[in-house]
């Protein structure tokens, strides 16, 4: 219900602002048919969430797609309206003619092109390789780790998407798979309806598949969701840890949205000096604390690097490391761009990714 209220409020604001912008600058938008179509598209973000879970899956997906595409269009229309307003103000002060209808037309064409590219980009994952050396592991004691985050299985991303992800991961032949949360998008019902978790059971990693919860994993009965994940041989670490070969210690934290302090992070750091210690923390907010507690590798996701350009200007200012790799004293931190998406099937920032970590032992 909270998500519906939030989405509904955002949709209403976008609808009002962008509709009036087009009414001012596009003669065709004066027709009743334009208004009704625009209203219908805007309502799909609510319709897709309000449909009963027993509704046909195709209807749920179609409504979700229409609503998501409209939201991206409306977002960029809002940016276009702001740009148009600034140019209009400049024209009044400086005294030049602003061809408003032509500017709006060029802007709309650019938006459609941008969204078309973003819809392709959202389904074009890349593999990013990171090489890390450590003296805590013996020379020749190497691990190939696949690091994932933000898969977001649900109304838009289902079984086929999970199957392609599994195939891509298995092609990399990892020893270990780590997931930094948000396997779920919003409701389990859509995952169960399509059996979207089943392909993840086919992930081939001899040392195991482990994950920490993200904020979305709590949205629908987190305990039953954990049980379903573990039925697919995914071990969930919630303020807990596990060992790999007695050499690597894996720590998974509850998401920052549930527990903002660092008490558990510190408690779980006991004996870190004896192991190569990896910590999974969905939101990249506790890097400095992890470094001070003696962790070796900090893995996070969540940011999607804003997903829609130019939102990374915001994520860069919110998080210490919204994307990529950085060193915090002796600790390495990596933030994953995410494999899925949320809200709209568009990515106009960085492409979705799988991070392949080559952990190389250099010790005696």
Label the predicted regions.
Residues 107, 112-138, 155-160:
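Hydrophobic alpha-helical transmembrane segments in integral membrane proteins
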Residues 1-123, 364:
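Non-catalytic terminal accessory segments
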Residues 133-364:
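Soluble catalytic domains of enzymes that build or remodel membrane lipids, polysaccharides, and related
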């Amino acid at each position: 219900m909270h998500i519906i209220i939030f989405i509904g409020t955002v949709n209403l604001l976008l609808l009002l602002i962008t509709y009036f912008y087009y009414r001012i600058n596009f003669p065709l938008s004066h027709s009743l048919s334009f208004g009704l179509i625009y209203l219908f598209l805007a309502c799909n973000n609510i319709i897709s969430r309000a449909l009963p879970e027993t509704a046909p899956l195709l209807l749920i997906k179609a409504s979700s797609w229409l609503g998501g595409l409209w939201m991206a269009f409306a977002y960029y229309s809002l940016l276009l309206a702001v740009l148009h307003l600034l140019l209009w103000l400049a024209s009044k002060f400086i005294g030049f003619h602003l061809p408003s209808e032509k500017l709006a037309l060029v802007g709309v064409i650019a938006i459609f092109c941008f969204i078309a590219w973003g819809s392709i980009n959202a389904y074009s994952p890349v593999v990013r390789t990171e090489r890390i050396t450590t003296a805590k592991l013996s020379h020749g004691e190497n691990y190939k780790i696949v690091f994932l985050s933000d898969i977001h299985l649900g109304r838009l991303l289902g079984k086929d998407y999970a199957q392609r992800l599994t195939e891509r991961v298995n092609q990399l032949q990892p020893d270990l798979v780590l997931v930094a949360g948000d396997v779920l998008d919003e409701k389990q019902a859509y995952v169960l309806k399509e059996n979207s978790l089943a392909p993840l059971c086919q992930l081939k990693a001899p040392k195991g598949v482990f994950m920490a919860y993200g904020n979305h994993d709590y949205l629908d009965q987190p305990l039953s969701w954990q049980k379903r994940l573990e039925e697919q041989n995914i071990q969930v670490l919630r303020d807990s840890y596990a060992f790999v070969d007695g050499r690597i210690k894996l720590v998974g934290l509850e998401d920052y949205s549930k527990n903002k302090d660092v008490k558990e992070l510190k408690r779980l750091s006991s004996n870190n000096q004896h192991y190569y210690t990896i910590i999974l923390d969905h939101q990249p907010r506790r890097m400095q604390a992890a470094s001070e507690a003696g962790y070796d590798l900090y893995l996070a996701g969540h940011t999607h690097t804003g997903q829609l350009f130019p939102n990374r200007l915001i994520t860069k200012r919110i998080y210490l490391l919204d994307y990529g790799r950085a060193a915090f004293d002796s600790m390495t931190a990596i933030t994953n761009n995410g494999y899925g998406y949320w809200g709209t099937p568009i990515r106009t920032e960085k492409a979705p990714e799988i991070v392949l970590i080559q952990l190389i032992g250099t010790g005696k």
